[in-house]
Amino acid sequence: MHADGNNPGIRAGMEMLGRPLDKGLSAFMEDLLQRGMLDDTLIIVTGDFGRTPKINSRGGRDHWTRLCTLAFFGGGIGRGQIIGQSDRTNSTPNGSSVSTGNLLATVMHTLFDVGQLRLDSSVPNQLLATIQRDAPIVAL
């Protein structure tokens, strides 16, 4: 969506990627709900970076590491929440921010008994260190 030779601008990109994502996630969520599996399945939608607050000269947005959007559903977490905010230019977090460590800790604490994971020798040490160092996103 940064509109270079290989990527469309925002309007075309949202049409090409946004609609199928919305349709697929909506159908998946509805299927999990109908099967009674939504509270046991945590879905997280994110990317590996955000996009610049301003549209560039080619009609797109470049990579931006200071801020990105996460969407959570299922897993027994609260619904209809907005957690955190950006500054008025949408360029940096305003107040506390959520790290990738917080995201990983949230997943692990939501889906597993973390005390039992600490006893499992097959769990990588780096993962255990992250779980011990970073707190889950409490507001969820």
Model regions and ranges:
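Ligand-binding pockets and gating/stacking loops
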Residues: M1-L140
